[in-house]
């Protein structure tokens, strides 16, 4: 058995936003055609309440593939060197069920979630839409900024976060890649 292992750096190198947005467009199209099997996630709570193990299987009809995302959610990890969400995505051969690959789930989730938003924005937003409001300043804010840049030319970006300090850090770190200044909003409504 030969299993490919792809860490976070490998995922980010291979699954770029310009690759993932069209993939998500295709996956959403397959979902609407009934070519996807995606049971509800299964959650197991640890008896002491310290965390959750989540299992999320799925099958895609085109290209035929299936796999499983296994993730832990450990709220006690906030403020430690460990992420609160960690896991892997496992892919299997459709014909024989053999394990093919184990990939870092955090990086896939960050990119895929935003790429789905990018695909939907591309399909539904006006061509001249260029204002972006981000509610939150974490990982998803950064990947959503990249996804929106992929599908629309941005003219204005506003961010609100529960922590103004985090919003300011996000604006500093992301302004160059945004191509426009990032404004800090005082409230989610203002953003």
Please identify what each model-predicted range represents.
Residues 178-191:
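Short acidic low-complexity segments
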Residues 1-110, 118, 128:
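N-terminal ligand-binding/catalytic initiation module
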Residues 2-4, 156, 181-183:
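Conserved beta-strand segments of alpha/beta enzyme cores
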Residues 134-135, 160, 185:
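Structural motif
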Residues 3-6, 149-153:
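Acidic/polar active-site rim loop that often engages polyanionic ligands
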Residues 150-178:
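NAD(P)-binding Rossmann-fold cofactor-contacting core
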Residues 75, 137, 162:
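Cofactor-binding loop segments of dinucleotide-utilizing enzymes, especially the Rossmann-like FAD-
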Residues 112-133, 139-151:
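Short internal alpha-helix immediately C-terminal to a glycine-rich phosphate-binding loop
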């Amino acid at each position: 058995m030969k299993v490919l292992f792809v860490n976070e750096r490998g995922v980010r190198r291979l699954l770029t936003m310009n690759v993932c947005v069209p993939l998500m467009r295709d996956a959403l199209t397959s979902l609407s055609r009934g070519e996807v099997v995606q049971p509800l996630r299964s959650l197991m709570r640890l008896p002491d309440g310290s965390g959750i193990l989540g299992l999320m299987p799925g099958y895609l009809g085109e290209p035929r593939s299936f796999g499983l995302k296994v993730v832990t959610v450990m709220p006690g990890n906030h403020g430690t060197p460990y992420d609160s969400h960690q896991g892997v995505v496992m892919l299997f051969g459709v014909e024989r069920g053999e394990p093919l690959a184990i990939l870092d789930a955090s990086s896939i989730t960050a990119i895929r979630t935003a790429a789905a938003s990018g695909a939907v924005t591309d399909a539904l937003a006006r061509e001249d839409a260029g204002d972006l409001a981000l509610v939150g300043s974490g990982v998803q804010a950064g990947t959503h900024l990249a996804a929106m840049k992929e599908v629309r030319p941005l003219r204005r970006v506003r961010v609100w976060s529960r922590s103004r300090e985090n919003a300011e850090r996000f604006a500093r770190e992301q302004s160059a890649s945004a191509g426009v200044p990032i404004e800090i909003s005082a409230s989610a409504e203002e953003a």
